[in-house]
Amino acid sequence: MSQSESPGLQEESLHGSWVELHFGSNGNGSSVPDSVSIYKGDMEKILLDAQHESGRSSSKSSHCDSPPRSQTPQDTNRASETDTHSLGEKNSSQSEEDYMERRKEVESILKKNSDWIWDWSSRPENVPPAKEFLLFKHPKRTPTLSMRNTSVMKKGGIFSAEFLKVFLPSLLLSHLLAIGLGIYIGRRLTTSTSTF
């Protein structure tokens, strides 16, 4: 094909499923497809148009047989990428009709399946389970045995009547036991040495 041929003939020749690219070499030894020099930027537009046409026809036939599926966050990202891509196409000599058509398709996809966000965010996995957090509480420290923590010490201290009623008899009894044990051991030792 040459540049003098009409663009309609160029598009008609590309409607087949295979396109042959003949590689030639430019002056510096690297190979460049001849079609790049022929179309000079029109190749991208032709390929995009062919992609959109084949996408529409294949999507119509494939949607008849397949059940509808819910939209995922990735689908939304793809839709927004298509939207930004279509903005770039509009600036690159894209017709206003195609731009508006693509824009409407993207908006309809987003409106039709916008409930997935609500469904996804209200899943039971995202609500923290209260019972599980109760199981992992840090155990309380057991209080150490101390005179300071007793109810007697908290009420009146060392000189309170309740404390003295308990402390003085126990002190006297422990001293009497210690003295009695000391006397018993002392006598045993003295009698055992005299028998030898």
From Swiss-Prot:
Annotated positions of the Phosphoserine modification: S54, S66, S86, S92, S95
One BP annotation, GO: mitochondrial outer membrane permeabilization
Places the protein is found: Mitochondrion; Mitochondrion outer membrane
Compositional bias of kind Basic and acidic residues: 78-88
Motif (BH3): 100-125
Coiled-coil ranges (or none): none
Biased composition range(s): Low complexity: 56-69
Source organism superkingdom: Eukaryota
Membrane-spanning segments: 166-186
Membrane topology value: Single-pass membrane protein
GO molecular function: identical protein binding
Record-linked InterPro entries: BNIP3 (IPR010548)
This protein's UniProt keywords: Apoptosis, Membrane, Mitochondrion, Mitochondrion outer membrane, Phosphoprotein, Transmembrane, Transmembrane helix
Pfam families: BNIP3
Record-level GO cellular component terms: endoplasmic reticulum; mitochondrial outer membrane; mitochondrion; nuclear envelope; nucleus
Region feature (Disordered): 47-101
Subunit structure: Homodimer. Binds to BCL2. Interacts with BNIP3L and ACAA2. Interacts (via BH3 domain) with SPATA18 (via coiled-coil domains). Interacts with BOK; promotes BOK oligomerization.
Family membership: Belongs to the NIP3 family.
Entry function: Apoptosis-inducing protein that can overcome BCL2 suppression. May play a role in repartitioning calcium between the two major intracellular calcium stores in association with BCL2. Involved in mitochondrial quality control via its interaction with SPATA18/MIEAP: in response to mitochondrial damage, participates in mitochondrial protein catabolic process (also named MALM) leading to the degradation of damaged proteins inside mitochondria.
Name of the protein: BCL2/adenovirus E1B 19 kDa protein-interacting protein 3
